[in-house]
Swiss-Prot record:
It comes from Gallid herpesvirus 2 (strain Chicken/Md5/ATCC VR-987). Its EC number is 3.4.21.97. Belongs to the herpesviridae capsid scaffolding protein family. It holds the Pfam family Peptidase_S21. This is Capsid scaffolding protein. Residues 501-512 have a biased composition (Basic and acidic residues).
Length: 663
């Protein structure tokens, strides 16, 4: 590897700030520094205090009034090659025509932004000497406060960002650095590739869990008085891409427990957006506008000292003082440039909704107490206010609109309720208002129709009548749903006294003449189903010539089966028609406690209603229920398999009860 392909990199910064560290172990007395410098030989520069990874040497050490400052030189092609190959070129995709040297400075500045001084431990009562300082290590974050370094290609540019450094100190550094560099010559450091790789990887691994490291670096950079640094990502001038600018963190003022407020240097290059009231003459060259991220601050000269003082007096009280930092972590510092852009962008956007209270010429609305009775028709009130249910039309802000009728007493029909509405309704609000108005109009006729009705009486009357079923419950003309067996009158004539008396004695049952047609239709359907079941069983019932015990000729009876034949019985063997089937008894005797009820049935063949004989008793019904339960254990029942409660039995019971109630 040719060293000429990779030029030397100069590094500069404070190794320690006097009085900044409260820890006794990290705090260095100034008298010890004065006793230790100048060193007999240039101190080596390594990475993370690894002695086998030396990459440069210290050129100059000075005792500045703020702390120990150094200037060093790094000339290690192995480290440069490792960083260049490890870094992705996509980092610089947004930067055009960037030189390889600038890329190297970006990488090394952000990968090793801090420095750490290694010094010998002094025994109690021991004084420092020339062997007190051991070496200088490049690292991500040093333990001492304010130990942020800068990298550049020349010694002058490396020490330029340190504004706290006095001109005499800068001159001493440059002179000592040139002398040491002349003694070293073109010295190149070649650590092993394995050592440099472990050192660079260890820096990333050891600090990967460091929280808010860029914020800490930014604060320590300000403590060191670094302004206008070009390559450090934590500085305000670093901008690899628009999304990677550090303006959001660089404006954070240094707040640290161990920081000395007297040693904190205030930022002198705050970005200021020139307002129309300001001119280029009012802003000196000491303040950058923020448009050019790679320009440095010019050197301060005595001629412009008074102007810079006046300018700083305008900037520092509001933005650059430590006392202006809000308490807690709920606030952020925003650069003036970004803030002015937001304000100007917001001011340039026109508002879509005009302020009617400002643009309107009409007087403020005063609700009327009581209107004159001579006023008829509709009452006009200013737009923006409307009676409930009468929305204000959109787009008529400067006109008086008729809003709602009034009664003869001068007030509103629903009371003087006036509600302020918004200046303009959205489509959804307009639809809701229209729907509410339609519902109000439809409800009004219904209320007038039922006014005075029995269903709209007082609570006491409804409570007394609720104990009995009203004889005239169906008053509406709508076709309400009804269940089988219930009857609904087709006419709405007032009930007679005889019907009221009949209802009280029969418990609300209707007469047979009204329920007959419905029951005839239902019985015809049942008869058809019975005939279909008979056909599916495959057996023709034998016709008997015997007469029934009630004098009814044979052939006039409809077959009535109370249950299917039990298993094992021949399907053709059945009880003769017209003959009453004996009720099975547990004692082997035929039950005599039975009731014969003639029920009219529609005979499709005869075309007229004929009576059938149905013998029903309590013991027979109990026997049928037990027999059905025993059969359900041997047969497939869809409702039982489905696991749903059976409702067919309840329907049959209701049907039979309705039939028996109207006889």
């Amino acid at each position: 590897m040719n060293p000429a392909d990779h030029p030397s990199v100069y590094v500069a910064g404070y190794l320690a700030l006097y009085g900044a560290d409260e820890s006794d172990e990290l705090n260095i007395d100034r008298k010890d520094i004065r006793a230790a410098i100048p060193t007999p030989a240039p101190l080596p520069i390594n990475i993370d205090h690894r002695r086998d990874c030396t990459v440069g040497a210290v050129l100059a050490l000075i005792d500045d009034e703020h702390g120990l400052f150094f200037l060093g030189k790094i000339n290690c092609p192995v480290m440069v090659r490792t960083l260049e190959t490890a870094a992705s070129q996509e980092i610089f995709s947004e930067l055009d025509n960037l030189k390889p040297d600038d890329k190297l400075l970006y990488i090394i500045t952000n990968y090793l932004p801090s420095v750490s001084l290694s010094s010998r431990r002094l025994a109690p009562g021991e004084t420092a000497d020339e062997t007190f300082l051991a070496h200088v290590a490049l690292c991500l974050l040093g333990k001492r406060i304010g130990t942020i370094v800068t990298y550049d290609l020349t010694p002058e540019e490396a020490i330029e960002p340190f504004r706290k450094l006095s001109p005499n100190s800068k001159a001493t550094l440059l002179s000592q650095g040139k002398e040491t560099e002349r003694l070293l010559g073109e010295m190149v450091w070649y650590p092993s590739k394995n050592a440099i790789t472990k050192a660079l990887l260890g820096t990333a691994v050891n600090n990967m869990l460091l929280r808010d490291r860029w914020q800490i670096i930014s604060e320590r950079r300000r403590m060191a008085g670094i302004t206008g640094q070009k390559y450090l990502q934590a500085s305000s001038f670093t901008a690899l891409t628009d999304s990677m600018t550090s303006n959001n963190v660089s404006v954070t003022h240094p707040i640290c427990e161990n920081a000395n407020p007297g040693n904190i240097q205030k930022d002198e290059e705050m970005q200021v957006c020139i307002s129309p009231a300001q001119t280029s003459e009012t802003l000196n060259a000491g303040v950058l506008s923020g448009c050019n991220d790679f320009h440095r601050l010019p050197h301060s000269d005595p001629a412009s000292t008074s102007d810079q003082t006046n300018l700083q007096s305008l900037i520092e009280p509001s933005m650059n003082t430590q006392s202006s930092r809000p308490p807690g972590d709920d606030f952020i510092w925003v650069p003036i440039k970004s803030y002015n852009q937001l304000v100007s962008r917001n001011a340039s956007q026109p508002t879509n909704i005009p302020d009617i209270a400002i643009t309107s010429n009409q007087p403020p609305f005063i609700p009327p107490a009581l209107m004159n009775t001579s006023i008829s028709g509709q009452h006009s009130i200013p737009s923006g206010y409307a009676q409930y249910g009468y929305p204000t039309p959109v787009g008529t802000h400067n006109s008086l609109l008729p809003l709602g009728p009034v009664n003869q007493m001068g007030g509103f029909q629903y009371g003087p309720q006036v509600y302020p509405l918004s200046y303009g309704q959205s489509p959804l609000e307009a639809k809701l208002t229209a729907l509410l108005e339609c519902m109000t109009k439809e409800k009004r006729p219904v209320d007038e129709e039922h006014r005075g009705d029995d269903m709209h009486t007082t609570r006491e009357e409804r409570g007394r009548r609720g104990r009995k079923r009203p004889y005239e419950f169906d008053r509406s003309i709508e076709s309400d749903l009804y269940y089988p067996g219930e009857f609904r009158r087709s006419n709405f004539s007032p009930p007679q006294a005889s019907s009221m008396k009949y209802e009280e004695t029969t418990g609300g049952r209707h007469d047979l003449s009204q329920t007959g047609p419905v029951l005839n239709s239902l019985m015809g359907a049942v008869t058809s189903l019975q005939k279909e079941v008979e056909r599916l069983n495959g057996g023709n019932l034998p016709i008997s010539n015997a007469q029934s015990s009630y004098g009814v000729p044979n052939g006039m009876h409809a077959p009535v089966y109370y249950s299917y034949p039990p298993p094992g019985t021949h399907p053709t063997v059945s009880w003769p028609m017209g003959v009453e089937r004996p009720m099975p008894s547990t004692e082997g005797k035929t039950s005599t406690n039975s009731t014969v009820i003639p029920v009219p049935v529609s005979d499709p063949e005869a075309g007229r209603n004929v009576p059938i004989t149905a013998t029903i008793s309590q013991e027979r019904s109990d026997g049928i229920q037990k027999e059905s339960i025993e059969q359900s254990r041997d047969t497939m029942n869809a409702s039982a398999v489905a696991g749903i409660h059976r409702t067919s039995d309840a329907g049959v019971d209701v049907f039979i009860n309705q039939m028996m109630a109207h006889q």
